[in-house]
Amino acid sequence: MMASYPEPEEAAGALLAPESGRAAKEPEAPPPSPGKGGGGGGGGGSAAEKPDPAQKPPYSYVALIAMAIRESAEKRLTLSGIYQYIIAKFPFYEKNKKGWQNSIRHNLSLNECFIKVPREGGGERKGNYWTLDPACEDMFEKGNYRRRRRMKRPFRPPPAHFQPGKGLFGAAGAAGGCGVAGAGADGYGYLAPPKYLQSGFLNNSWPLPQPPSPMPYASCQMAAAAAAAAAAAAAAGPGSPGAAAVVKGLAGPAASYGPYSRVQSMALPPGVVNSYNGLGGPPAAPPPPPPPPPPPHPHPHPHAHHLHAAAAPPPAPPHHGAAAPPPGQLSPASPATAAPPAPAPTSAPGLQFACARQPELAMMHCSYWDHDSKTGALHSRLDL
């Protein structure tokens, strides 16, 4: 296969027409993006200045407020005017207004470089003007709101301490006025005095309550002696004559101590009086407990049948030729209607003492009386 070479005419044509090759390469340049659009350099510059509405501006809230105030005609704006400027300048803030508007209010109130100026005409129109502090005019370097200088706070003297010679309401408050007190030489002027306060009420000095005087030592000794006497009366018993004498004697020394002692000594028993008056004396001893009941009596004294057996004479011996009847038969000498032996008189001193101490002895069951009753019933049956 033979190699083909270009003809001289073609090579010469390529060397003689370099400009035509450049013109052919120019259409290969990338076309401009549709976002930027054509229309000359002026259109591209305006598109670069307009921010993207979907992107948050890189400025702090302090910078946004300062920017709005500086670009206003009077160098001051109300809160609503600041809101309108930020929304018109940065469309990003058209949504979620509640969040960033609260931040704007907080920065206006807490930052010292913003000064509140009241409106003319009093309270007829709502809202106040906000302006920049002259000392903070250059807080942004050369108009660059992204870089903020550190500002030194202006020196403010600390509030003076309260002094007795100065009134809290100022000179107007000391004079009894009802207007707003101004800070002067006579007062601080922090508060406006109320209308109902008068100069006489503010200038009067009210005395402090005095502490009670201590009780003298002699009164303490008398109270201790009265407590000891009341303890002795309580130990003796409420019904003893010594207790009544002690209660009468307590009325004298206790009356000098206080009204409680006088009332208690007249109406309460000695034990209760002692609980109040025994300030310095020893504690009162409790009354002794009552004695325990005696144990059941083990028959130390003879019963009535014992006394009757001891006092009855021995039986008389039988006559000549008379035989003693058997145990189950009655004697002819003894009538059938013979009454049972009478009980012994209760005039014996031992029996009276036993019944007085133990009444249950008189009602105690005894086998002797059962035997006599059975014998009497047997005699009545035999007589029938």
Swiss-Prot record:
The covalently linked position for Glycyl lysine isopeptide (Lys-Gly) (interchain with G-Cter in SUMO), per the record, is K25
* Localization in the cell: Nucleus
Q: Keyword Ubl conjugation on this protein?
A: yes
Q: Residue ranges of the DNA-binding region?
A: 56-150
- InterPro entries, alphabetically? FH_FOXL2, Fork_head_dom, FOX_domain-containing, TF_fork_head_CS_1, TF_fork_head_CS_2, WH-like_DNA-bd_sf, WH_DNA-bd_sf
Which terms does the record give in the GO molecular function aspect? cysteine-type endopeptidase regulator activity involved in apoptotic process; DNA binding; DNA-binding transcription factor activity; DNA-binding transcription factor activity, RNA polymerase II-specific; RNA polymerase II cis-regulatory region sequence-specific DNA binding
Please describe the quaternary structure of this protein.
Interacts with ESR1. Interacts with UBE2I/UBC9. Interacts with SMAD3. Interacts with DDX20.
Q: What does this protein do?
A: Transcriptional regulator. Critical factor essential for ovary differentiation and maintenance, and repression of the genetic program for somatic testis determination. Prevents trans-differentiation of ovary to testis through transcriptional repression of the Sertoli cell-promoting gene SOX9. Has apoptotic activity in ovarian cells. Suppresses ESR1-mediated transcription of PTGS2/COX2 stimulated by tamoxifen. Activates SIRT1 transcription under cellular stress conditions. Activates transcription of OSR2. Is a regulator of CYP19 expression. Is a transcriptional repressor of STAR.
> What name has this protein been given in UniProt?
Forkhead box protein L2
The organism encoding this protein is Oryctolagus cuniculus (Rabbit)
Q: Gene name, please?
A: FOXL2
